[in-house]
Amino acid sequence: MDVRPVEEDARGIIDPATGLARFRLDRHPPSPALARFVDRHWVATWDLTGREPFTQRVLAHPVVNLVFTDGTATVHGPAAGPVGRRLDGRGWALGVMFRPAGFRSFADRPLHALIDTSLPAGEALPGGEELERAVRDLDPGDPDAVAPLLARVEDFLAALAPADPHPAEGTRDIVERVAADPTALGVADLAAREGLGVRLLQRRFADHVGPGPKSVIRRYRFYEAAERARRGTPPDWGRLAVELGFSDQAHLTREFTAVIGVPPGRYAARARAGR
């Protein structure tokens, strides 16, 4: 599986240049046994000793993350909007980022029940108490604890992974096709392209992904707009708005500002200044 470094793919990280001056983010591919379900493992490390705490805002992918930090193991469901993570002192976090719909093969509930929800691993995964015990006594300031923990997490998930195909894997493929081409596409267009009725598509997303298809399409459009904004020469915002399915530049600017916090032009200028 292709896992690109954050410098090449910062989708979901709001104002990455500012954040990456304060923490390091490494990405690792999953083992072959987990590649059907897991997109990547990520490791964040920081040392802000003697510096102001920093809150990194993210517009997370429409997926589940299993996160280990500060002695806890927590399953974070898909977030409906931006969320912030406060960093202070010295620390690390290990995350398992599942593929879209990938967590459904492990879960005992539809994923719409996990939107904007965080649960201890023991409540969200069969036998997840083992993961809570694995991280409980680790030094939260020692990044050397991450590698053996990651190996243990991989073994745990591989043992839990179903051998037979799960219906969610078809929905995963639909979402990943949207992610690869987030241009102008409505829910009805997507349903027709996939040979599904709109209501069936919506039910599959609610069960397997969490957010509905409209929200997922919108999320990937924002990623594309933010990535275009931070790279090289600022884009033609009017043309980009039409390409990504917004009615006009004003619509893109209004939606972008509501989600990201600043207009796209200002976001682009900030990104260029941070390089």
Residue ranges and their predicted role:
Residues 205, 217, 255-257, 268:
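DNA major-groove recognition helix of helix-turn-helix
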Residues 224, 251-252, 258:
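Hydrophobic side chains within alpha-helical segments
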Residues 1-198, 208-213, 227-231, 236-247, ...:
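Alpha-helical bundle regulatory/interaction domains
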